[in-house]
């Protein structure tokens, strides 16, 4: 992105960074895209919003569109998916969404940044929202990121990472790889990877999901 935090609109040659404009203003960042085949609005964009760098007043929201260009065609605001507050005792931070569909067909919503680690919960692929959250209650939605989901891992101090999770499955190795960033936004910033040959449902049903 540019100096202003913006969401790249599209790029024919992403490796060469030939961006063709932006699709949102400075309030949205860390997007992830999920394609729901057969849906009226099949392109689901999960976007992060925070009240300042390093804060925990954060939300991940969902916008559904008919075109991958997002603002190029019709779109629908699906609202807040999950939210966190600055003064929460669990040091959670609801940004950096990642959507991953496992080999058993279950789809997961993965999030978390910088503070108390990376979290995971099952996604309802009919709505694009997270299973287990009462979306009929504004109060519940606004505190949904506090002590919700399963924490996969974090640093011992609870700060300086991990953040920015991104998960892929390699059918040749049979492993799921989760890439995350650690450290402060400086020379010690580094990228790490964790892997597992178990499905996430197997991990979440175990006694120690951190392994």
Give the positions of each predicted feature.
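Carbohydrate-active catalytic/glycan-binding domains of CAZyme proteins
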Residues: 1-211
């Amino acid at each position: 992105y540019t100096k202003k935090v913006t969401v790249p609109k599209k790029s024919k040659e992403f490796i060469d960074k030939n961006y063709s404009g932006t699709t949102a203003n400075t309030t949205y960042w860390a997007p992830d895209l999920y394609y729901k085949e057969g849906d009226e609005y099949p392109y689901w964009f999960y976007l992060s919003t925070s009240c300042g760098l390093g804060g925990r007043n954060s939300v991940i929201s969902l916008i559904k569109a008919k075109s991958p260009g997002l603002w190029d065609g019709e779109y629908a605001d699906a609202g807040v998916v999950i939210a966190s507050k600055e003064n929460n005792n669990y040091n959670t931070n609801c940004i950096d969404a990642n959507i991953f569909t496992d080999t058993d067909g279950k789809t997961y919503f993965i999030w978390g940044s910088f503070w108390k680690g990376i979290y995971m919960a099952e996604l309802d692929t009919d709505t694009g929202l997270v299973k287990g959250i009462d979306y009929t209650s504004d109060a519940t939605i606004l505190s949904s990121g506090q002590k919700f989901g399963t924490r996969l891992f974090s640093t011992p101090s609870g700060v300086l990472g991990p953040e920015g999770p991104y998960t892929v499955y390699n059918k040749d190795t049979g492993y799921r790889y989760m890439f995350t960033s650690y450290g402060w936004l400086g020379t010690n910033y580094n990228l790490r990877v964790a892997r597992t040959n178990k499905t996430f449902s197997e991990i979440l049903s175990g006694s120690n999901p951190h392994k």
